[in-house]
Amino acid sequence: MAKKSKIAKERKREELVNKYYELRKELKAKGDYETLRKLPRDSSPTRLTRRCKVTGRPRGVLRKFEMSRIAFREHAHKGQIPGVKKSSW
């Protein structure tokens, strides 16, 4: 499980990205890079990291399920993810 402070920091970044999304889009269209540079750094979507929705782990996250590989494996074995089953051939 990730530290609660790291998860909270990431959530705060997501809020800032959503808040400044339209303004950033307009400034980029105008080419006003000076004003764009003055916006908060955390309002840039490139600073976001995908985290596991279950554990908060930042690495090894499967985009489709928004889970880390470890949490995905546990939930898949228990049958808690619809449409996913262990393959065998």
Curated annotation (Swiss-Prot):
InterPro entries linked to this entry: Ribosomal_uS14 (IPR001209), Ribosomal_uS14_bac/plastid (IPR023036), Ribosomal_uS14_CS (IPR018271), Ribosomal_uS14_sf (IPR043140)
GO biological-process terms attached to the record: translation
Signal peptide: none
Transmembrane segments: none
Alphabetical keyword list: Ribonucleoprotein, Ribosomal protein, RNA-binding, rRNA-binding
Listed GO CC annotations: cytoplasm; small ribosomal subunit
Function: Binds 16S rRNA, required for the assembly of 30S particles and may also be responsible for determining the conformation of the 16S rRNA at the A site.
Family: Belongs to the universal ribosomal protein uS14 family.
PANTHER family linked to this entry: 30S RIBOSOMAL PROTEIN S14, SMALL RIBOSOMAL SUBUNIT PROTEIN US14M
Quaternary state and interactors: Part of the 30S ribosomal subunit. Contacts proteins S3 and S10.
Name this protein carries in UniProt: Small ribosomal subunit protein uS14A
Record organism: Staphylococcus aureus (strain MRSA252)
Gene name per UniProt: rpsN
